[in-house]
Amino acid sequence: MHLLRILPAALAFALAAPFSSLTAAAPTTLDLSHQLDEERAERLEKLIERFNSRQKDYEVKLVRRVQGDPPKDLNLVTREEQARFVAAKANFKPLHQVMKEANMPFEAGKLAPELRVGLGDAKGELFALPIGLSTPVLFINKAAFSKAGLDPEKPPKTWAEMLKAADKLFDAGSTCPYTTSWPSWVHIDNLSSWNGVEVSDAKGRLNFNGLVQVKHTAMLTTWAKARFFIYFGRRDEADNRFAAGECGMLTSSSSLYGPLHESRKVEVGVSSLPYHDDVPGAPQQTMAGGYSLWVGAGQKPAEYKGVAQFVSFLMEPDLQVEFSAVAGFLPMTPAARAAAGSK
């Protein structure tokens, strides 16, 4: 009787064992916290799906960040949030340490210098990855340029050329020859950097009242009175106006290129931010803003290994080129930038 009770159990175990051994282990889940708008989240989701399909050990999931929640495995942080994240170092694990412990190659020195600002220590080691940074550029409405007798393949390079273009657009009937999004970022921070003007003194005190800044602000005031420059708000309100075909020229984030290109409502031309050709040494370089990727502290070793693999995936030049093309973000390495420039 005792034997009869044991045999069915043994048989069941024997039958189940081969099938259980065939069952693949579930992938380790890596949460990526973000506060992106729906459109940008969809773009990032496509990139994540590609990583997930290339290997079976890890599954990255995009989750919306809730205020007060502890950091996730991966955290997409804006420039505005960055100071708070740097201050709360105990909540995050330095990226260079994650890569070293996972024995994954990672050379921070290969990343463009302007992208590493504020994300590393004195030794050049990175705390986070500058994955989603953008810079201000000039967008033009090619149809509006053609209507005004302007060459749509030759966007203005200087503010003097911008004035001539705005004048012709206005004469051609445009009610919005030129507009801008993010005015303080474009017309203070980047105007100063692009034209080689300091925005703070040796003690770190802000100084926006230099000759170039005052002259530029006065110029925009004159343009506004002449209806050459139309102001829609201090954030990205002007983006929608340009996307709807209302404006001939727009200065805004390079990350707008993807949505504009995909909407196909406006045939768009893109050029560098205009500079003042009467300022010695101009142009120099614009400033990068946008998103960086931070790693949460207190995660499991297997999760950190997956994070390192995901970061290596993001560093691939071909992927950077593609992401730059669809999202307008800056390629992180000179090699990727060279590849992007050849396409």
Where does each model-flagged region fall?
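Extracytoplasmic/periplasmic substrate-recognition and gating elements
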Residues: 53-54, 148, 223, 229, ...
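Short helix-initiation/N-cap motifs at beta->coil->alpha
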Residues: 63-70, 157-163, 230-243
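Conserved N-terminal structural module of periplasmic/extracytoplasmic solute-binding proteins
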Residues: 22-90, 100-107, 152, 236, ...
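Short, solvent-exposed loop/beta-turn-alpha elements that line the ligand-binding surface or hinge
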Residues: 96-111, 155, 177, 196-215, ...
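Hinge/lid segment of periplasmic solute-binding proteins
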Residues: 81-137, 163, 269-271
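Long, aromatic- and glycine/proline-rich binding clefts that accommodate carbohydrate-like moieties
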Residues: 325-343
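Glycine-centered hinge/linker elements that transmit conformational signals in sensory
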Residues: 163-168, 203-233
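Paired acidic/hydrophobic, glycine-rich loop segments that form the ligand-binding mouth/hinge
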Residues: 73-78, 248-253, 269
